[in-house]
Amino acid sequence: MATLYEEYTLCGVGPDKNSSSSGILGIELGKDVDHIIVTNSSRAVTVYKVSDQKPTGSWTVKQGQLITCPAVYNTKSQEYVVVTDNKVIRVWKEDDVNMEKAFKATVSSDVLRVIAASDSEPVVLFSCGAVMFLDSLLASPQQTIEGVLTEEEFIRWSTVVGAEHQLVLLFCTEKRGEHYLYAQRFNPNTVVKHRFETEPGPFAPISFSATCRGSNIHLQYLYMSGRIYESVLPLRSSVSEAEGVQALPRSLCLSLPLGEQELTSGAAIVLDEAHVAIVGFPHPSAGAGKDYLCIWNKHFQTLQACKELAGTIYSQIWCYSGKLYIPHGKILSVISFECQKSSLAAAMGKLKQTNQSESKSHTPLSSWTALPHNDSINAAKVKSRMSTRNASNVKSPLTVDQLIDHIKTAVVEDVQSAVGEFIHQTPQTDLQLAAGKVTMVLVSRSQTDDSFYPQRAFLQLLDTRYLCYSVCPELLSLAMAKRDFQLCQIAFQLFPDIPEAVTCAYLKTILSTPDSEMETLTLDTESLIIMKEMSPAQSQMEEGEQQNENGVSSSKQQRDFLSMDMKCPVGLHKGVLLNDVLQTAYSDKPLLQHLKDLTVLQVMVFLQYLHFLYLKYSQDVHKQIRALRIPSISQVIDWASLILDAHFTVLAVAPEAKSLVSDLHKFTRSQVKLYAELGKIEGSLQSLKKPKSTEHTGVYSIEVIELF
């Protein structure tokens, strides 16, 4: 899972008059992870201390001069390096006030970029494709530079990666629509040229990002079509490498949903083995004119975090030490992020319990966008029978585009009927791709038209099992805003990729809704049976029994926390929804941050309900209804621990929480004491089982022998 934290402004930017550029030439890491170097496209280089959000130094060139590549920090000499007017290399220290008085050298060929390398001299890349270390170049600035590139070939992107004492310079070039990758290795000094595969249609790579993992270089590149490919190169040169231009094998990592938009720019940067951050591409369910930063998980093809950014996004993004630097509008924002380990267990978080009976009632899917095999067969059979029976009356099925046009103008009833017919008549393979697109259009209109909310259509689309949170993130937000708990319940039972922030928002919505409002809800029958089994007295509660707006029972019931026949502190329907939240996949650390948004009253109600569940488990109630949908005891304990961690200080000082915390402490202590005594009994029983060793009595005699 991935988390984006609150953004803050580092500095302002001066976008060009045509607003197509942010005015930032580049951002490089400074002397440590808390310092960055911002080079604007005019005349200034500024060093910022990120934690303080303040500049620590700034240098400018004279009027008429122009900075032509981003400034970098030389870790070897602890100096800053920049190029002006393509051929003048300037070197200065942090305590130098005036860049003009610092060292400068004019070289014989245009410099494209100076690239910093950790534990090494910076690498100078010339526009002609030649490469030299900075110290070697400055030793003889006017030395002849031999070109590498062919005529009409120019460099579009470059970077340095390294590991295991090996440094590799990568740069991508373009010539007449063809794209090439050069890999310049320094130990030994070799250069290999690769050709990118051609993407079908008028698409070209627009963003590149490279990382080094193990003994390989992983290059990922983004096309205007929304596809991200990965190519793997060996870190060290191979003796068997062929001469000439080599093919660059690639594999598809991620295909971004473009919708109806046409894109000419965008940027993607690799965060770790599984995650990639993207700007300039549309959010799957955002309306036109909205720009987002999105983090996608390539392994599971899911959108895991997003943040809307105000103003124009210039398709620029940099990443250093867990922070993303993104210019948008008239500011440069810093956004911290965190990515959990990219394994199935981590991506799925704390999973639902999987007992035998549950697995029969809810078959796990091999893919989040695929039906179980038997379900697809049954669906095909039903569809076949229906088609045969009504062949003469069935209209030709709508295409996806026709249905979308119909959704944009028709009334709710017509839309719901059209969606139902579309689902019934569309082949499963086509429906798998169309369900998400149709849902996004329905959500988009529902957000702009308050009178339009096709609940039945949403439920039908959910029933296809072709939706997940990443396909349409705004669906759950819309359902919560409409207080559509029936849709939310089904989504939380089906979606395996709901972010922790959405889980907490849903929990807050449930706890803030009065029980009286929930009693009329249509919820899953099986889940209601669970609550009635767990609180039979409450299911037959008389109308005169008072409840407060959050479903808390009378004070007499609340105080009797050590009683095993404690009544449920919330209404049956609210308990059903809370049970679904308890079984939702999550990761501890991201969830803990969002749980802090709950109010004290909401925390108390939730803790009371968790305590109620734990008491029922102590009575072995869960064994009587184990075939039904119910959270496990470990899930209850995990959530209680997280709530206490998130609100420990508040619960410790709030007067109204004193009795609750005290009763929880008493009950926990009694449980610990009980288990300790049971442990002693178990030890005694084990000792009784051990066979006792038989006592052997030794018989001996003394014989006296007289020799003389």
From Swiss-Prot:
One of the GO BP terms on file: positive regulation of transcription of nucleolar large rRNA by RNA polymerase I
Keyword Transferase: no
Record InterPro entries: NOL11, Nol11_C, NOL11_N, WD40_repeat_dom_sf
Residue ranges that the Swiss-Prot or TrEMBL entry lists as coiled coil: none
Top-rank taxon, per record: Eukaryota
Compartments reported by the entry: Nucleus, Nucleolus
Gene Ontology terms: cellular component: nucleolus
The keyword Ion transport belongs to this UniProt entry's keyword annotation: no
Keywords, comma-separated and alphabetical: Activator, Nucleus, rRNA processing, Transcription, Transcription regulation
Function: Ribosome biogenesis factor. May be required for both optimal rDNA transcription and pre-rRNA processing.
Protein name: Nucleolar protein 11-like
